[in-house]
Amino acid sequence: MTTTQGSGRRAALTRRPRPSLSNKLARGLWGAVWLLLFRPSPRIFHGWRRVLLRAFGARIASGALVYPSARIWAPWNLEMGAGSTLGDGVDCYSVDKVILGPRAVVSQRAYLCTASRDIDDPGLALVTAPIVLERRAWVTAEVFVGPGVTLEEGAVAAARSVVTRSVRAWTVVGGNPARPIGARPPVED
């Protein structure tokens, strides 16, 4: 179940043991904090949500935006660069690392999935791989991004795409499974 990282490929999937009791307790505590303090916070209180996420181990740069309806499974596996965004309704299943570079955007109701099951294993072992969105990458509305995917600098996944392979810089992909459908001009900061 391993593939090489790079354009059109996924990172190697890592077999994981069952979550420990401490992991389950931490996720339970985070779930309570999300429900009571994160989710009901006013839309413009991005700073408050950054504080809550950092308290649970997330590495979040100033200016990163996380909307109140975004769900983060394990904040300690989340890294967000300056100006990056997790939009409304995003589901960040961060069993492994989810890394958003500067100005990377994940739009409404997208699903970032870092884990799956090994269908070749009779016990269906949990396997994970990180998801990386490099600088200015954009996951648009309702896109599914699978384990081990990297969207290189400026790459775009068009609405409702299913992205299971990494995407080259400044390339636009769409469909199920996602395939290149265009390019966008490079942008300098």
Regions found by a protein language model. Give the residues of each.
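Short conserved AdoMet
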Residues: 61, 150, 168
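Flexible, glycine/small-residue-enriched loop-and-beta-strand segment within the central core
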Residues: 40-50, 70-80, 85-150, 176-177, ...
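Terminal amphipathic alpha-helical/low-complexity segments used for targeting or macromolecular assembly
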Residues: 1-58, 62, 136, 154, ...
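Beta-rich strand-turn-strand
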Residues: 141-165
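Acidic, glycine-centered active-site loop in nucleotide-sugar glycosyltransferases
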Residues: 169, 174-177
